[in-house]
Amino acid sequence: MKKTILTVVLCVLTLNTALAQFDTAMFVSDVFLLDNYIKRQNNGINFKDTKTYRGTPYNNPNFLPGNIYKEGTLLADNIAIRYNAVADEMEVKQTLSSNDENARVLTKSQDIYVKIIEDIYVFVPYQGGVENGGYFQVIFEGGQIALYKKHIKEFIPEKKATSSITKTLPAVFKDKPVFYLVTKSGKFYQMPKSRSKKLKVFGEKQNQMKTFTKQYNLDLNKQEDLLTAVKYYDSL
């Protein structure tokens, strides 16, 4: 009888270990996938050699503490995460002091979201597929509407000096974020670059929004002012 109980316990422990390993594999891919993917996305730039370019291909060049959640349940706590905006990948390693070479790529899934310090990132599939989907930062989530931010990096290649009186200009990564209003049903409405056209996104309430933004002198091209306007819109 004791042997039977011991056998059952060992089987349960083995199964739990296997499930834990499987769960880990589900949200973290092989490290070589990360290395290969970055090489295809780096435009001939070595990301580690920061002297060769200006700006950063990342939202933040440093790994920061964060958590990973799956369907609202904590999956990984206080690990090191960095968002590669160029590759649209979440790079993950066990601790902040872990070697960057040990970083892995988080599996893209709409069921998994990331919190880096206080910033929340969600993965949104495109037409039901992962391939053309992407990560968005949740700036605000209200009762009726949410404000999402898509981090986009414009890459400007290095410009070699053409004469002795000119100098070589390093490659540049420029921030070109795009904001979206997101409805509860999951519809995305991109905010245009023009201030006046942004108001049209508010639809039937654009006149109220125009009055509000004028009253408080809000510049909808600035994230802080746009957030103020969206919060007001959500309250209407």
Features from the language model and the residues they span:
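Aromatic-patch recognition
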Residues: 59-192
